[in-house]
Amino acid sequence: MRTLLLTLVVVTIVCLDLGNSLICYVTRDGKTATCPPGQKCEKYAVSASHTGHWFHRWHCTSTCHEGPYNVCCSTDFCNR
């Protein structure tokens, strides 16, 4: 009985991942991805120099871009 209980506890921990996974937006239309350990969510602005317009990129990263329109964060779905 103890073995069964221990097995269930281990399976639960593995399946739940103890909350260490970070979920970020990775596209404009709201698709998400689970980031590798140690990474953050980012939304950063990129200038299309030939048009003068800005557009955004969403992704997981270990190094965030700096800038006034950029978001770098470490909670689920924080890079909207």
UniProtKB/Swiss-Prot annotation:
Record keywords: Acetylcholine receptor inhibiting toxin, Disulfide bond, Ion channel impairing toxin, Neurotoxin, Postsynaptic neurotoxin, Secreted, Signal, Toxin
Tissue and organ distribution: Expressed by the venom gland.
Annotated GO MF terms: acetylcholine receptor inhibitor activity; ion channel regulator activity; toxin activity
Subcellular localization: Secreted
Disulfides per UniProt: 24-41, 35-60, 64-72, 73-78
SUPFAM superfamilies: Snake toxin-like (SSF57302)
Domain of life, per lineage: Eukaryota
Gene3D superfamilies to which the protein is assigned, alphabetical: CD59 (2.10.60.10)
Signal peptide per UniProt: 1-21
InterPro entries (UniProt xref): Snake_toxin-like_sf
Recorded GO CC terms: extracellular region
Family to which this protein belongs: Belongs to the three-finger toxin family. Short-chain subfamily.
Protein task: Neurotoxin. Blocks muscular nicotinic acetylcholine receptors (nAChR).
Protein name per its UniProtKB record: Three-finger toxin MALT0059C
